[in-house]
Amino acid sequence: MSENVVSTGAVNAVKEVWEKRIKKLNEDLKREKEFQQKLVRIWEERVCLTKLREKVTKEDGRVILKIEKEEWKTLPSSLLKLNQLQEWQLHRIGLLKIPEFIGRFQNLIVLDLSRNTITEIPRGIGLLTRLQELILSYNRIKTVPMELSYCASLEKLELAVNRDISDLPQELSNLLKLTHLDLSMNLFTTIPPAVLNMPALEWLDMGSNRLEQLPDTIERMQNLHTLWLQRNEITCLPETISSMKNLSTLVLSNNKLQDIPVCMEKMTNLRFVNFRDNPLKLEVTLPPSENIEEEEERELFGLQFMHTYIQESRRAGNQVNCSTTSPNSIDADG
């Protein structure tokens, strides 16, 4: 009996030794595998970094990363070694997201990631206090973070053809240097209050949205000289539009306007307007030009058309003043 006990104890001891050895061997193999994977990652990052370095150019004194029509769904962290970059131009590379570490590129002046498949803007974008141009057109972005308002140097913002953006955070009115804003081909139903309160805005494109009317507070955009509103559903214009003294270009083609209001006569700085493809009530024929060249260059639904329409409207006793937006319209506060 005692011999059996001794024999069993010896077997258990040997078993325990072997189990420890096997466990240690497995741990060693795991560490070895992890080490090899780490080496592979380091090697891949070095290869990526080498490829990225080859894409860096210098133009007009700026250090630019320029990639187009290559497959870069994500950007490696090794890119951080190129933190001297001042401009990114990454087009048609299938990029799925802006890297979270974007905020560490403190020297960035231009970030152009148009024509990719980006779905969101990281909050870290707000750390780019030197950024002057942000181009994110032709992506799949649905919302804009309020942190973008921290980009105090931003002068140009393009979010065209994302198709699903319907509003902007109010905080974007703090972009005191923003002069150029492109929101065309999205889902806006009104001009956001943030836009109406951007003090330096000079150029705005909200074409191909779902605008039905313009807010009375549109007059706040006193520095605006160019306004694109083509391909919307606008039915009337507010009287306050005539107070936009610096407006020189106004495009209203492909809307639902039935009349051109008399108040637009006051807009003496207008140099170009377009009322083409609106269901206007009056049919207006422009007087013939003195020569063929003038006839060819004349805009059929432009400035002369507008003034002629207003005159015809007066003769017909069909004067239409600029409308005030209806009580249920969305006004811009603050």
From Swiss-Prot:
Residues 10-47 form a coiled coil. LRR repeats lie at residues 84-105, 107-128, 130-151, 153-176, 177-198, 200-221, 223-244, 246-267, 269-290. Its main location: cytoplasm. It is found in: Cytoplasm, Myofibril, Sarcomere, M line. InterPro entries: Leu-rich_rpt, Leu-rich_rpt_typical-subtyp, LRR_dom_sf, LRR_domain-containing, LRR_R13L4/SHOC2-like. One of its GO terms (biological process) is intracellular signal transduction. PROSITE patterns: LRR (PS51450). Interacts with MYH7 (via C-terminus). Component of the sarcomeric M-band which plays a role in myocyte response to biomechanical stress. May regulate expression of other M-band proteins via an SRF-dependent pathway. Important for normal contractile function in heart. This is Leucine-rich repeat-containing protein 39. It comes from Bos taurus (Bovine). The lineage of its organism: Eukaryota, Metazoa, Chordata, Craniata, Vertebrata.
